[in-house]
Design a protein with these regions (language model features):
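Beta-propeller and closely related beta-sheet repeat lectin domains
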Residues: 2-3, 41
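Surface-exposed extracellular loop regions of Gram-negative outer-membrane beta-barrel proteins
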Residues: 4-32
Length: 292
């Protein structure tokens, strides 16, 4: 058995054994340093690993023991380091930092303050793929599990999370964006002409699509509606505001785009209440440029 003692300054002492009163059954494994931990609920077990919320991100303790505190790329939050470091800079002294593993949902949840008056967001990592997402609208001071179900404590109330198809009776807003991908390689620019997100739903739902190039954000604007629709063909409505009819089968509609760039990302935005929706994949048409 191992036990780790972590100080507020990030000093870690690891011991091995079963009886601290017996020198033959208790020994020091090592002492090392990590970035300073944040909050009193900064540690979570993920299998045999310990993840610690620190000023440099969410770091695995065993890997940091093998490396050193300056190797920030070892943090499991490396892909979202910008968002985490911004939160650390602004709210590291604010109550509410916490980590929790939710086996039923197959994700790890990191509760992060987003203000000084009870505002919070949750950064969520898929335990199977390592992909990150963010939950908003759940201002949780603390999280816990009861009989495998997920709960959080809000302002004077306890809520059951990950339950039902609405957000306390109102619509659930969803906004997803892919990573920027250098389609066809990094060496040339491309002219992007059409995209086809593969989306399925069990009801009519509004789905709006955006398209960004060269690390820009929000190059198209859209406002989803909660109204149902019979659908719209790609050549009869604006590509970034058309409503898709949701069925139990996937939607396979091409949307025209007209952008030139080195890389691209696709955005999808929707809202739902009492319905479910899945984004499976995306197809894209582009032409590679020649030379500079």
């Amino acid at each position: 058995d191992y036990i780790a003692f972590i100080t507020s300054e990030g000093e870690v002492a690891v011991y091995q054994g079963t009886d601290p009163s017996d020198a033959t059954k208790w020994s020091l494994v090592g002492v090392f340093k990590i970035a300073r931990p944040i909050g009193k609920r900064c540690i979570v077990n993920v299998g045999p690993e310990l993840i610690v919320i620190t000023e440099s991100g969410f770091v695995p303790l065993t890997q940091m023991y093998a490396e050193n505190e300056s190797n920030y790329s070892k943090a499991i939050s490396d892909k979202i380091s910008g968002s985490i470091l911004t939160a650390v800079t602004n709210f590291k002294s604010t109550f509410g930092w916490e980590a929790l593993i939710y086996p039923k949902g197959q994700f790890g949840l990191f509760n992060v303050p987003n203000g000084v008056s009870g505002e919070f967001v949750q950064f969520v990592v898929n335990l199977s793929t390592g992909a990150w997402g963010r939950f908003t609208g759940q201002d949780a001071y603390c999280w816990g599990l009861l009989n495998g179900d997920l709960y959080f404590g809000g302002n004077t109330k306890v809520y059951k999370a990950d339950n039902g198809l609405s957000d306390a009776g109102v619509q659930i807003q969803g906004n997803a964006k892919t990573a920027f991908v250098y389609y066809g390689g990094r060496g040339t620019s491309k002219r992007f002409t059409a995209i086809r997100p593969i989306v399925s739903s069990d009801a009519d739902l509004p789905v709006s699509i955006g398209f960004d190039v060269d690390f820009n954000d929000g190059t198209s604007t859209y406002t989803p509606s909660s109204a149902t629709t019979t659908g719209s063909e790609w050549d009869n409505t604006a590509w970034d505001s058309g409503l898709w009819a949701g069925t139990i089968s996937s939607q396979l509609v091409w949307r025209s785009v007209a952008d030139i760039g080195w890389n691209a990302a696709i955005r999808i935005k929707t809202s739902s209440q009492a319905q479910s929706i899945k984004w499976h994949s995306v197809d894209i048409y582009y032409e590679k440029g020649v030379g500079l």
